[in-house]
A protein has these predicted regions:
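An N-cap/entry alpha-helix motif that binds or orients negatively charged groups
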Residues: 1-34, 143-203
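N-terminal capping/small domains of soluble enzymes
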Residues: 1-127
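Alpha-helix-loop-beta-strand connector modules within alpha/beta enzyme cores
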Residues: 66, 82-93, 146-149, 154, ...
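Glycine-rich beta-to-alpha transition loops that act as phosphate-gripper elements at the mouths
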Residues: 75-77, 99, 202, 221-227
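Short, hinge-like loop/turn segments at secondary-structure boundaries
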Residues: 89-92, 111-112, 138-141, 237-240
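Glycine-rich phosphate-binding active-site loops on the catalytic face of alpha/beta enzymes
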Residues: 124-130, 237-240
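Glycine/aspartate-rich loop-and-adjacent alpha/beta segment that forms the canonical ThDP
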Residues: 128-148
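Glycine-rich phosphate/ribose-binding loops and adjacent secondary-structure elements
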Residues: 207-240
Length: 240
């Protein structure tokens, strides 16, 4: 239903062309949170980009900096947030999942602050794990499980092995969620982390308030789908 509705909305859009307007001076530049950006776009959280390209998360951040747009570092990034900040001078935001363990969650917020981020993007529509049918069909899991199907895929893609897999193991070892605290960090070859730890079904606006109370910078919520929740977000001190 959601897919059908999304397609219907896009099909209903029309471009209204106006003429005889002076467009000799035009710019896509705008400003958000007191900083100029080249266009009203930002790189969304892109976890596991390192599976596609060696140092993929760093490459994304550098590309965003060159283009003059924000880049959002993901909680599930394969590269530590501190390494991304050090490697890429740009407008970096951080995406946060509200873990079940509130002490771990708040300690993680402090780590994000210490790393130098000034904009926090809190994901609120992940109370349960996603039903990704294409992942089930392909056998892809997070963390990776070296099944016969996966091993066959790796062996038939020697280019990826040379460009991505080999550098990863030589520099960092097995793929892992680099930002996870030791208490429930797991290598991508270990048993998958329980969604009950990372996707709390008890999250509420009080959790947002606790983070807002300690976060000094800009704070956004990701995943709002109704105007009523937008109003609540504003009432709870969100910037967007």
């Amino acid at each position: 239903m959601a897919l059908q509705r999304n397609r219907e909305v896009y099909r209903s859009l029309n471009i209204k062309n106006r003429v005889l307007r002076d467009v000799s001076k035009r710019s896509t530049t705008t400003e958000i949170f007191g900083r100029k950006i080249a266009m009203p776009y930002a790189i969304s959280p892109t976890a596991s980009a390192g599976l596609m390209c060696d140092g993929g998360e760093v490459a994304l951040a550098k590309a965003a900096a060159r283009m003059g747009v924000p880049c959002t570092v993901a909680t599930n990034s394969l590269t530590p947030m501190e390494e991304i900040v050090e490697a890429a001078d740009g407008n970096l935001w951080f995406q946060l999942y509200m873990w079940v363990d509130k002490n771990l969650r708040m300690a993680f917020v402090e780590r994000i602050k210490a790393a130098g981020f000034d904009t926090l993007l809190v994901t609120v529509d992940g109370s349960v794990g996603a039903n990704r049918e294409h992942d089930r069909k392909s056998g892809y899991t997070m963390p990776l499980r070296y099944t016969p199907k996966l091993i066959a895929g790796v062996l038939t893609n020697p280019g990826w092995c040379l460009r991505v897999l080999a550098p990863q193991y030589l520099k960092r070892g097995p793929f892992r969620k680099a930002n996870y605290p030791a208490e429930f960090s797991s290598k991508l070859t270990d048993k998958p982390t329980d969604h009950d730890l990372t996707k709390p079904d008890t999250q509420c606006w009080d959790d947002i308030k606790r983070i807002r109370d300690v976060w000094p910078g800009h704070m956004l919520v990701k995943g709002l789908q109704s105007w009523e929740d937008v109003v609540l977000a504003a009432d709870n001190g969100m910037d967007g």
